[in-house]
Amino acid sequence: IRQVIAAALPERNEGVLKVLIGAGQGGRGYARLAKPNINVAVSWHDVPAVYQSWQQQGIHVGTVPVSLARQPLLAGLKHANRLEQIFIKQALAHTDFDDAIVTDTEQNIIEASAANLFWLVGGQWFTSSLALAGVNGVMRQFILDNCPDIHIIEQQLTEIAHVDAMFLSNALMQIVPVKTLTLGESKRELAIAPVLSLHKSLAQAYVGEYGAA
């Protein structure tokens, strides 16, 4: 794998290296081969330029009418079977939102279209339980490791109408505050200062973990 990655790396200092590891062609009827023919696909991408302004100014978030199925065997894992996310992104493209809150089929908040969610109520930070759906992103886990007071809960979409602040996180955007939250006919301005403060408090730990801010 290291040889494949080394051969694909361009002479650049910053970007996104995507590595997909597959089990190769399987048998009939979804059966896996006893000894899979593992393949590795590598691609290089630029970091989306919009992320820097998102981090500083915040984004507009709403909802989409696509839910995630509950499947505890896959919950938390980042895998290549992401058909639901394709439907979510298609629905998002028909809105004016930068991203959307995504629930499971029981209306529990899970994540955003390609990021994890955190929200602030009464001075306490919360994030969604991913026991039955969603992806436990590396940035989410980094935040939880360094902020042990964050509560992991099951939360219905209807119960977050009065949050004080909210942010999205993933490995590329890191931490992005939500500037406005639209739920149905209700649109609210959220505070971004608590998010910026949290992001700043994690900067030293982030450099220690990943070597760059």
Cite the ranges covered by each PLM segment:
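Helix-start/capping segments and mature chain N-termini
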Residues: Q3-A7, G22, G27-A213
